[in-house]
Amino acid sequence: MFKFITKGKKSNIYSISDDSYEYSYTGVTKAEYDNYIQSLKDNELSQYAVNTIGANHYATYVSEKYGKQVNVAYYANTNTAKVIVSKLGYLPSSEGTQINSPKTETLAQLAINKIKNEADNKYYGGMIYVAQLQDGSFVIIDSGERFEENREALLSYLEANNSGTGFAKPQVTWIFTHGHADHVGLAREILATEEYRNRIDINLIAYNFLNEDTYGDFYWDIDTDDTTAGVHGGAKSTIANFEAAVEACGATVYKYHSGDVLTIANCKIEFLVTHEDIYPYPFFDVNGSGTVFKMTFATGKSFLVLGDATEVTADFLLDNYDDDTLAVDVIQVAHHGTSSNEKADEYKNDTTNVFNNYRPQLYKKVSDLGCSVALCPNLSTNTNLGGSYNTAMNSYLTATWYFHDDTYVVNMSTLAVAKFN
């Protein structure tokens, strides 16, 4: 049914999930990519979406007959192409919305409880971001661990800011970057518990995690998860339990791919990197499989979400995206501002300074392009953010930093930042 690119160097097939698979090609020209797109049309697949980000090209084609979709990406700077064939699922709309009385768009970094590592007396993990859009609805990004304080911090914030929207309950789109417990644990509890879930209306859940077949040794194959095993213990169980909760809650699920555009209330969300782009480079850690996306609000102000992105992901961004894409007003500091979990000594980084593990070139790039607000999902008192390490970070990322000791809210019109009480 589907022809594939015949020229260029092809990697082994990559089993993603849900009967989905990917071919990755190097040495592909734009003409060869165009020929492949034509072959999809010749096979009577219908075009659902096309997108360009800088010099990169993306397309989604669907076959109702076979219940399949084909997502294709071409990265011009590196002459690489990705072909992903998967079951036909939810397809996002990129259309804007007429809103008569738009609300001021905001972006909040919530103060949350964190896991304490008794060995070094530091607190690690967890992040929750909440964007409120012109229509009053919310986009939540990730979640903290399954602590009561985190649950009430999130639900109370949503309910307090739902006033005046006209909605009976907060309207939520929930996007996840990767499957570590400090990013999905709280969400899993809310989704699985009717009492908590009924306090909000979940319109869409969006994620793209590794397949179990691709987990590798870095997934601790134990039966416990979330807070019972620490931040990262039992990641395999964590993802399985999260996906079971997603299925049980009955919400619409969207498996995004790079180049996809999801528009909600005139906020444009572009997915820039997934684990499908990093392949065939090996995943040394779950963080290396995470997603990066950019939110451009109706005001034109933008937010770059890095999750726990590693230096490999940072290099992919620098190698494949132009200045217009990387120019943002607000950035989420990757991996809670801490050092990388990647095997930097096996990569091309200078390991003499731990901060180099996070590719300071990316932070310098966004700073040079005018980024003015840095949201760091960690406590300012953590010693791993202090001293020369903190100085090194600030020398590259020169924006004003805000930590989640308190809940900070960014006005996405003026970029003014205020504490939420």
What are the residue ranges of the model-derived segments?
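Compositionally biased P/S/T/G-rich terminal and signal peptide-adjacent segments
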Residues: 1-24, 84, 90-92
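Active-site metal-binding motif and surrounding structural segment of the metallo-beta-lactamase
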Residues: 148-207, 320-340
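Structural recognition of the beta-strand scaffold that forms the well-ordered cores
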Residues: 130, 138-142, 171-177, 203-208, ...
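Active-site environment of divalent metal-dependent phosphoester hydrolases
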Residues: 125, 147-148, 179-185, 212-215, ...
